[in-house]
Design a protein with these regions (language model features):
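Alpha-helical transmembrane spans
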Residues: 2-87
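OB-fold/S1-family single-stranded nucleic acid-binding modules
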Residues: 155-173
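Extracytoplasmic
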Residues: 96, 147-153, 161-164
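OB-fold (S1/OB) nucleic-acid-binding surfaces
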Residues: 109-132
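Short nucleic-acid-contacting surface segments enriched for D/E, G, S/T with interspersed K/R
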Residues: 132-155
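Structural detector for short beta-strands of small beta-barrel domains
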Residues: 92-113
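Hydrophobic alpha-helical transmembrane segments and immediately flanking/interface helices
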Residues: 85-95, 130
Length: 173
């Protein structure tokens, strides 16, 4: 009997950290609106605080624009990465390994380590702290790979630095 334990899916919750630059950008965009309210008259050219207002305005626009662009680029990169991996999985271009889980090492609940194991000499490693499209849920957080001896079929790909990214996990009983 075959039991699908994991299949690559787009998880919006993993995109949440990318929103941080967006909020930083919005905050800096509105700095020049806030500055005159805290320092009345500084938005007038003849006032003593005008230079501070101009600096706040330019810093707000520059940092805000940079943070917004960072948000857009990170989000686009995350979506494109998912689509590429999904296409590899859907077109059966993923590497397949089947066998028993060996040398299993669980990630501790403290999270200061990785979870890793081997199947037929192929090494897999992941951590809950990774923002990636692919399997990265350790057993201590409800992951599906829990112990040595599990008979699994895994579809994966190698990334640019040689890590094996898990796209699909099937338990064979």
């Amino acid at each position: 009997m075959v039991n699908v334990l994991y299949e690559l899916n787009f998880n919006w919750i993993e995109s949440v950290p990318y929103i941080i630059p967006l909020f930083v950008g919005i905050g800096f965009f509105f700095t020049f609106k806030w500055y005159p309210s805290q320092n009345p008259g500084t938005d007038q050219k003849c006032s003593k605080g005008y230079v501070g207002y101009v600096v706040a305005k330019w810093v707000g626009w520059i940092v805000g624009t940079f943070a917004f662009c960072l948000f857009v680029l990170l989000t686009i990169a995350h979506v494109v990465d998912y689509r590429e991996k999904r296409e590899i999985l859907d077109n059966n271009h993923a590497i397949v390994v089947e066998g028993m889980v060996e040398k299993y090492h669980a990630q501790p609940l403290s999270g200061h380590d990785t979870e890793h194991f081997e199947i037929n000499g192929i090494y897999f490693e992941y951590s809950s702290g990774e923002l990636l499209n692919g399997y990265n849920t350790p057993a201590c957080y409800g992951g599906v790979i829990k112990e040595n001896g599990q008979h699994l079929k895994i579809k994966y790909l190698k990334d640019d630095i040689g890590n094996n990214i898990i796209l699909y996990i099937e338990e064979i009983e």
